[in-house]
UniProtKB/Swiss-Prot annotation:
<feature type="compositionally biased region" description="Basic and acidic residues">
    <location>
        <begin position="319"/>
        <end position="328"/>
    </location>
</feature>
<dbReference type="InterPro" id="IPR001763">
    <property type="entry name" value="Rhodanese-like_dom"/>
</dbReference>
<feature type="region of interest" description="Disordered">
    <location>
        <begin position="319"/>
        <end position="350"/>
    </location>
</feature>
<dbReference type="InterPro" id="IPR022111">
    <property type="entry name" value="Rhodanese_C"/>
</dbReference>
<feature type="active site" description="Cysteine persulfide intermediate">
    <location>
        <position position="200"/>
    </location>
</feature>
<keyword id="KW-0819">tRNA processing</keyword>
<dbReference type="InterPro" id="IPR040503">
    <property type="entry name" value="TRHO_N"/>
</dbReference>
<dbReference type="Pfam" id="PF12368">
    <property type="entry name" value="Rhodanese_C"/>
</dbReference>
<feature type="domain" description="Rhodanese">
    <location>
        <begin position="146"/>
        <end position="240"/>
    </location>
</feature>
<keyword id="KW-0560">Oxidoreductase</keyword>
<comment type="function">
    <text>Catalyzes oxygen-dependent 5-hydroxyuridine (ho5U) modification at position 34 in tRNAs.</text>
</comment>
<dbReference type="Pfam" id="PF17773">
    <property type="entry name" value="UPF0176_N"/>
</dbReference>
<dbReference type="InterPro" id="IPR020936">
    <property type="entry name" value="TrhO"/>
</dbReference>
<protein>
    <recommendedName>
        <fullName>tRNA uridine(34) hydroxylase</fullName>
        <ecNumber>1.14.-.-</ecNumber>
    </recommendedName>
</protein>
<comment type="similarity">
    <text>Belongs to the TrhO family.</text>
</comment>
<dbReference type="Pfam" id="PF00581">
    <property type="entry name" value="Rhodanese"/>
</dbReference>
<dbReference type="InterPro" id="IPR036873">
    <property type="entry name" value="Rhodanese-like_dom_sf"/>
</dbReference>
Amino acid sequence: MPVLHNRISNDELKAKMLAESEPRTTISFYKYFTIASPQQTRDALYQVFTALDVFGRVYLAHEGINAQISVPQSKVETFRQQLYTFDPALDGVRLNIALEDDGKSFWVLRMKVRDRIVADGIDDPSFDASNVGDYLKAADVNAMLDDPDAVFIDMRNHYEYEVGHFENALEIPADTFREQLPKAVEMLREHADKKIVMYCTGGIRCEKASAWMKHNGFNKVWHIEGGIIEYARRAREQGLPVRFIGKNFVFDERMGERISDEVIAHCHQCGVSCDSHTNCKNDGCHLLFIQCPQCASKFNGCCSEQCCEELALPEEEQRRRRAGRENGNKIFNKSRGRLNSKLSIPDPAE
């Protein structure tokens, strides 16, 4: 029986990827469709992807698939063909190609079965996720941005919105997508007669959010086809003004794609203009924050003097301290509250 998971250390895999001579293409795709046996599908797809030297992160659930991957350039077309023929539901699925790509976005293939491909917290049995809003293409997006009757809603996390968003888009202040959904309904009640335009990175969150808004009585709902990635690509190809301002945060080693020249965020430590995210180098912290080159040098890549001091401790002492911390206070906690607390940043909601 073939091995259906990775057995090599992350350090070895990363070194191997960095030593590759062939360029890679970073691709993301998703599809909401019924998967009867997610584990069986996962195992079969793992073998297909492994044979093509695909790296990345793939989630499968009964409701569909969500993938962010990198593929050797010489195998992209073979990958496309094998994906499209793997299941009829995947035939022709849109592949979002990264806008900025050094080919170093992933170095290992991880495939996981989950309850949902996007954690939404929805437990209403009458909710129909297929009853989505209408798609908007790039030219339509620009027209909507000039329509005083339209309201743009950003369905991404606070750290994504901070470095880039559409002109005058509303941020839904919440730490997770599941928290955003009910809050979006609440916030938009006063705009019930407006045209609601929802967007996210690649389309997967805003597509479900558009269905949720319709489920809650909103009738004029749109979402951007392919999200920010597809919008920017098509706008550039068609010679249209790109109306997204700043950087598009992405969930891989790049942590962002430059969409426009504007830098709308600031270093969380000194306040200079900066939109480069990083994780605190202290393994007991890993706070996601924005850091300029000068502060990166001053704090040795850490978010605070405390973490800088801890990073300088012997490895054994660092491990001892990490063992005594709650998991929720580590890298997986990207909440605005933790960021504000660690770096003494005023809460914009207050």
